[in-house]
UniProtKB/Swiss-Prot annotation:
Subcellular localization(s) per the UniProt record: Nucleus, Nucleolus; Nucleus, Nucleoplasm
A single GO molecular function term of this UniProt record: ATP binding
Record-listed cross-link Glycyl lysine isopeptide (Lys-Gly) (interchain with G-Cter in SUMO2), residues: 207
Residue ranges, annotated region (Disordered): 83-234, 496-523
Signal sequence range: none
Positions where N6-acetyllysine occurs in the chain: 70, 155
Listed name of the protein: Nuclear valosin-containing protein-like
Region described as Interaction with RPL5: 1-219
A Gene Ontology cellular-component term: nucleolus
Gene designation per UniProt: Nvl
Origin species: Mus musculus (Mouse)
Binding site for ATP: 304-311, 621-628
Oligomeric form and interacting partners: Interacts with NCL/nucleolin. Isoform 1 and isoform 2 interact with TERT and isoform 1 exhibits a higher binding affinity for TERT compared to isoform 2. Isoform 1 interacts with MTREX in an ATP-dependent manner; the interaction is required to associate NVL with nuclear RNA exosome. Isoform 1 interacts with RPL5 in an ATP-dependent manner. Interacts with WDR74 (through WDR repeats); the interaction is independent of RNA or pre-60S ribosome particles.
Acidic residues bias spans: 90-110
Keyword ATP-binding applies: yes
Length: 855
């Protein structure tokens, strides 16, 4: 039976159904529902998303087609076997049949090619019984013919007439002798005749059985070979299916890992390790909690910026407790098939309970636990609900099932609030940006296996790396090692150039010819040198390797190549700005030291006096007077982390995003305390509020006020702000407890201008000044009365450009080049081009503003 022309048959599905049936998974009877569900499970990529009923109907159609084809194939084999048997019987027939018998046989057996297979099969079975009676009639007919021959002769007496024609129907013989006298022939059925008849039939049956047995043996041998090949093919198919299922099961299950990391490998987090040790007591002594009847904590949430050591701490916990760890990345749990993500979570927690005591570590857990009220898909909500259920089920398990769940994320605020309640991730450990002391301990931990000089200064290197986390310091060590190798190879190459040419080795000229043309620039020279190092396969000798070590200069060179990840998060590294780079402003410097540096350097005295919350400082004054430079110098001198926030960059067009940005800034500072937050152009963030205004700026001001002095205390978080217009800032932000101290950074007086000029020119050495230049005279010039520090910097730069322009013109005219210096004439030319950035009108306004702030 073939499918109708209008019925579509999926050939791939048909082949897979045949493969499934041949694997003997279904037994003797086939249930199409089970067959369809198994196919959807095995081939989830192709059929996983199809509806069950529709797919089951399609499988039923394919199964009916396969069944009909199998029946037709079996019927064809039966017919071919019967025809082959009849052909062999005709060849081995030892009896001669009469003309009538031949005619009857020709009539009885139709052409198998033209007959219907079913009809021909039935007719062959029907003729089988008839052929036995026909084959036994010749003796009886011969005997009858011999007795009747004299009676049926012609009157002429020589030629005999034809024997009477007989027809057989169903074993009965009918005499159809034409015309004349009919003789009634006696039907003699005596014992002799019956015995002879039985003997003839038995002989014929034995012949047929012997032929059938030989035919069966031949077919059995051929069929045995075919069955053997078929069995081998089925075994191969079963092996492939089993391997595929095992591979899928292995990919779905999470392997247990044994961690070799200890707490001693985690440097610079002593306070964090102390807190973690208190939380892990129940993993060592569960009998205490069981005796007290208290459910031990099950979840720990590690959060902090990227690279701060969350994954390392999780492995250190597993290694310190000597427990296996089930590590899984959160995106691996998410699946495209509905319900499979939840199943993976259930299997993960079931595996953890069966392997208890153990630790489950879910990295980047925020990928599967967003806030359900803002989740865009139902699948995300179901995953969160499933994780909550699994966490609650751990509390219902007996206390002997010691399972600790650790989650790590960079964005704890994006997690669903239900996940952070008691009984789930009730313990949160914050890993912030390490301070200078923590960086020193991290460097000592990372450099334990490195070859360093004995007098290596870790403190100085830690001072040069503000904003670096553990991953950045590891990258710094790797880059410093590369710099050390490069330095040694360069030294070796320089020594080889000085040595005479060794016999058998190519000279430097040959190497340059092999490398290409001679370098025409410094970049090409460096490239050729590096190519020479790559192609040089001579290993370093033990003498050269003996003195090889990573020096402090290698780390300093590597600092230019490594960009800390915290810098992308808003942290600014300012290692080069010190008090020496700021001329004058002595009184403001003392105020900043007392407000920011004193609480860090003298915490005990501040606690004794009851000085808790650090005061915020507002730097006000005209632009270009050094407000930002002061903030950088404070952060550098104190060794604190530094977050620079530009006012306009926090504003966002979407409702709630600006407030969230302000909240994230303070949260980052708390995680990295002690830390300095510097708000540049704070007037853009905190404009004066009015009764009619209810826009985004009002919400930002309210959020900023709450973060500065709200219910949550900000310990070791110092606030610096700078503005050119303190008069337009909201008055609420200037009250005590927030930005309660305002320092006015005004235009420098003549004495301060002298100090600023000396700082800019490095006491007349850079740029080199001529003997006729007097910095005090320039600073006391009336044209400098409205100059700010930025204007004085522009004046020195313009004077240097005038000197360079004069030197270039002299070289064009062929005049001998002399020593390049900046003279008084160049400063006079610069005065003509550089104008003060603060006009007299603005100066009057700032003086009035200064008087109002001092009252």
């Amino acid at each position: 039976m073939k499918p109708r022309p209008g019925v579509f048959v999926d050939r791939k599905l048909k082949q897979r159904v045949i493969q499934y049936l041949s694997s003997n998974r279904c037994g003797k009877y086939v249930d199409t529902g089970i067959l369809a569900s198994d196919l959807q499970r095995l081939y989830s990529v192709d059929y996983g998303r199809r509806k069950r009923n529709a797919f089951r109907i399609q499988v039923e159609k394919v199964f009916s087609i396969i069944s009909s084809e199998k029946e037709l194939k079996n019927l064809k084999e039966l017919e071919d076997g019967h025809l082959a048997k009849r052909a062999r019987q005709d060849e081995e027939d030892e009896y001669t049949e009469s003309y009538s018998d031949d005619d009857s046989n020709m009539e009885d057996y139709p052409d198998p090619q033209s007959a219907n297979p079913m009809n021909s099969s039935l007719l062959s079975l029907y003729r089988r019984g008839n052929s036995e009676s026909v084959s036994t009639t010749p003796k009886w007919g011969q005997r009858e013919a011999t007795t009747s021959t004299p009676l049926l002769t012609s009157k002429t007496g020589s030629v005999p007439l034809k024997t009477p024609a007989r027809e057989s129907e169903g074993g009965w013989f009918i005499d159809k002798t034409p015309g004349g006298k009919k003789e009634s022939l006696p039907l003699d059925l005596s014992d002799d005749q019956s015995n002879s008849k039985k003997q003839d039939s038995e002989i014929q049956i034995l012949k047929d059985s012997s032929l059938l047995e030989s035919d069966k043996k031949r077919k059995g041998r051929a069929k045995g070979k075919g069955n053997k090949r078929k069995t081998e093919n089925l075994q191969e198919v079963d092996g492939e299916i089993e391997a595929l299922l095992q591979k899928k099961a292995k990919a779905r299950s999470t392997e247990l890992q044994i961690s070799n990391v200890k707490f001693e490998d985690v440097g610079g987090n002593d306070a964090t390790l102390k807190e973690v040790c208190k939380m892990l007591i129940h993993m060592r002594h569960p009998e205490v909690y069981q005796h007290l009847g208290v459910v031990p904590p099950r979840g720990v949430l590690l959060h902090g910026p990227p690279g701060c050591g969350k994954t390392l701490l999780a492995h250190a916990i597993a290694g310190e407790l000597d427990l296996p760890i089930l590590k899984v990345a959160a995106p691996e749990i998410v699946s495209g098939v509905s319900g499979e993500s939840e199943q993976k979570l259930r299997e993960l927690f079931d595996q953890a309970v069966s392997n208890a005591p153990c630790i489950v570590f879910i990295d980047e857990i925020d990928a599967i636990t967003p806030k359900r009220e803002v989740a865009s898909k139902d699948m995300e909500r179901r995953i969160v609900a499933q994780l909550l259920t699994c966490m609650d089920d751990l509390n219902n398990v007996a206390a002997t099932a010691r399972v600790l769940v650790i989650g790590a994320t960079n964005r704890p605020d994006s997690l669903d609030p239900a996940l952070r309640r008691a009984g789930r991730f009730d313990r949160e450990v914050c890993l912030g940006i390490p301070d200078e002391a923590a960086r020193e301990r991290i460097l000592q931990t990372l450099c334990r296996k490195l070859r360093l000089p004995e007098t290596f200064n870790f403190c100085h290197l830690a001072h040069l790396t503000p904003g670096f986390v553990g991953a950045d310091l590891m990258a710094l060590c790797r880059e410093a090692a590369m710099c050390a190798v490069n330095r040694v190879l360069m030294k070796q190459q320089a020594q080889q150039k000085k040595k005479p040419e060794i016999e058998g080795l190519p000279s430097e000229g040959d190497q340059e010819e092999r490398l290409g043309a001679e370098p025409t620039s410094e970049t090409q020279d460096e490239l050729q040198r590096l190519l020479g190092l790559l192609r040089d396969q001579d290993p370093l000798s033990e003498e050269q390797m003996q003195g090889l070590c990573i020096e402090l200069n290698d780390f300093i060179v590597a600092l230019a190549e490594v960009q800390p990840s915290a810098k992308r998060e808003g942290f600014v590294t300012v290692p080069n700005v010190t008090w020496a780079d700021i001329g004058a402003l002595e009184d403001i410097r003392d105020e900043l030291i007392m407000a920011i540096l004193a609480p860090v350097r003298n915490p005990d005295q501040f606690r004794t006096l009851g000085l808790g919350t650090p005061a915020g400082i507002l730097l006000a004054g005209p632009p270009g007077c050094g407000k930002t430079l002061l903030a950088k110098a404070v952060a550098n001198e104190s060794g604190l982390n530094f977050i620079s926030v530009k006012g306009p960059e926090l504003l966002n067009m979407y409702v709630g995003e600006s407030e969230r940005a302000v909240r994230q800034v303070f949260q980052r500072a708390k995680n990295s305390a002690p830390c300095v937050i510097f708000f540049d152009e704070v007037d853009a963030l905190c404009p004066r509020r009015s009764d009619r205004e209810t826009g985004a700026s009002v919400r930002v001001v309210n959020q900023l006020l709450t973060e500065m002095d709200g219910l949550e205390t900000r310990q070791q978080v110092f606030i610096l702000a700078a503005t050119n217009r303190p008069d337009i800032i909201d008055p609420a932000i200037l009250r005590p407890g927030r930005l309660d101290k305002t320092l006015f950074v005004g235009l420098p007086p003549p004495a301060d201008r002298v100090a600023i000029l000396k700082t800019i020119t490095k006491n007349g050495t850079k740029p080199p000044l001529d003997e006729d230049v007097n910095l005090e005279t320039i600073a006391n010039d009336l044209r400098c009365n409205c100059y700010t520090g930025a204007d004085l910097t522009a004046l020195v730069r313009e004077a240097s450009l005038c000197a360079l322009r004069q030197e270039i013109t002299a070289q064009k005219n062929g005049v001998g080049a002399g020593e390049l210096k900046v003279s008084h004439k160049h400063f006079e030319d610069a005065f003509k081009k550089v104008k003060p950035s603060i006009s007299i009108k603005d100066q009057v306004m700032y003086e009035a503003l200064q008087r109002s702030l001092s009252q």
